[in-house]
Regions:
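Cleavable N-terminal export/targeting peptides
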Residues: 1-38, 266
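Transmembrane beta-barrel domains of Gram-negative outer membranes and organellar outer membranes
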Residues: 29-266
Length: 266
């Protein structure tokens, strides 16, 4: 009963956050939108900001991870990890995220429960020019809405700068980067990522990324790489799949993720 109540409370919280974001957005979409651009693919975020009046849902409906540490194997499935994005003002978007529902198996122990949520914003800092990369800032907080096993039980801040060098590259190529800091229970980690993309066709893209986490105070560095594909089914709908492996022991050994994104109105 307690678990059902907790899930119900999380649903109410999520619905409330989404309603607030919708009310805060402009009533009419402005301008003809470009093809959908999401933060779904790989670990880092896109530097693109949603146009005013548009609402975008990005859902990782299935994620699976395997790891082995101290001869103890673990399997972790995450369902419906979602991000809700609102084009609030020109060069500014509001965001709410839910980190998903977990099913975890470690050794002979099983556990399940909801993850925390997120409130954040993305703002344009620099426009692309001949001398500088397009750069945005993504900053926010995690909200402790999850079950104890999957929550920090605190409000944790984070931020990342997202410089993109895509406009310096040939038309079919892209390069986005992420440099920032996240906190978890007062422990800070420096996080980085660099994503390289190639447009196979007008609707299909391939991406590869190196990423990592370096504790600022103490702990072990974690580094990995991943790769994946996006398929723009329509101008406002995208499917994606990506997978990754660790480059050192502290990182997750292997993971795979599949997602769906839609922007409204079209």
């Amino acid at each position: 009963m307690a678990l059902k109540n907790h899930i119900h409370q999380n649903r109410i919280t999520t619905q409330t956050f989404v309603l607030i974001l919708l009310l805060a957005s402009t009533s009419n979409a402005s301008g003809k939108p470009p093809p959908i651009s999401t933060d779904r693919i790989l670990q880092g975020n896109s530097p693109d900001i949603l146009q005013p009046g548009y609402f975008q849902i990005e859902t990782g409906y299935y994620s699976y991870e395997t790891d082995k540490e101290n001869n103890l194997k673990s399997k972790h499935t995450i369902l419906n990890s979602s991000s809700f994005r609102i084009g609030f003002r020109e060069n500014l978007e509001l965001r709410m995220g839910f980190y998903g529902y977990n099913f975890q198996h470690i050794g002979s122990e099983d556990d399940s429960g909801s993850s925390d949520s997120e409130l954040s914003t993305k703002v344009l800092l620099l426009k692309a020019s001949e001398s500088s990369p397009k750069t945005t800032l993504n900053a926010g907080i995690s909200v402790p809405t999850g079950n104890d096993s999957f929550s920090s039980n605190k409000v944790d801040p984070f931020f990342s700068f997202i410089p993109s060098f895509t406009h310096f590259l040939p038309e079919s190529f892209s390069n986005d980067n992420s440099i920032g800091v996240t906190w978890n229970n007062a422990n800070a980690d420096f996080k980085y990522g660099t994503i390289w993309g190639y447009s196979i066709s007008e609707s299909v893209g391939f991406y590869g990324e190196f990423f990592g986490s370096i504790p600022i105070d103490s702990g072990s560095n974690s580094h990995g790489f991943d790769w994946g594909f996006t398929w723009a089914v329509k101008n406002n709908i995208q499917l994606d799949i990506f997978a990754g492996k660790s480059l050192n022991d502290p990182a997750t050994d292997f993971f795979v993720n599949m997602g769906f994104s839609i922007r409204l109105p079209q």
